[in-house]
Amino acid sequence: MQGKGVRIIFQPVLQTSFTIGSIETFTESAKRNNQKAKTKVIYFAELVVDKRIAAKTGFNIGDEIYYLQRLHYLDGKAIILNHNYFLKSVAKDLTIEIAEKSIYDYLENTLGVSIVTSKRIMTVEKMTEIDEKYLDLGDYNCMAVVTSHTYNSDGVMFEYTQSRHRPDYFSFQDNATRRSI
């Protein structure tokens, strides 16, 4: 019998969905979802990692980093607040202007950094004062939070990011495969 055992399992990716199994920039995701992206830097600082930051991020005490707070808009709505920490030795000469365009584009295409892998944890957390200040949360009192440790081809963790998403715009899509034991 022709075609026996073949099923089409493709489902189109939902609007405003982000992928789990790949590293995709905010701009790339917006483009894939046919939405207009904008990023605004609301805080930018150069810091030296202390004990508190090391415990939170995994960077070494004494590392020089950039710390940014970036607000991501989709179709004019503020939906994601990112707390980004970048190792200065990798993200050399990072500026607000670059951060409002695409940090990954700058790293890959200007600095030649090969971004290889990201370890992510997804949680739901109570909103903070800064979430409430910058994101129109309506009746929501919590945020979907994606925490990432991202590594380059030398195995160096160059980025720690906490990405805080409005719950009504949070959708991550993945395809899972069962492995035999």
What are these regions (language model features)?
Residues M1-I61, A91-I96, E100-K101, E108-V116, ...:
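HTH-adjacent hinge/linker in prokaryotic transcriptional regulators
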Residues T27-E28, H72-L74:
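Short, charged beta->alpha transition segments
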Residues Q35, L81-S89:
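Acidic/polar active-site rim loop that often engages polyanionic ligands
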Residues G58-I61, L74-K77, S89-V90, I96-E97, ...:
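C-terminal regulatory/effector modules of DNA-binding transcriptional regulators
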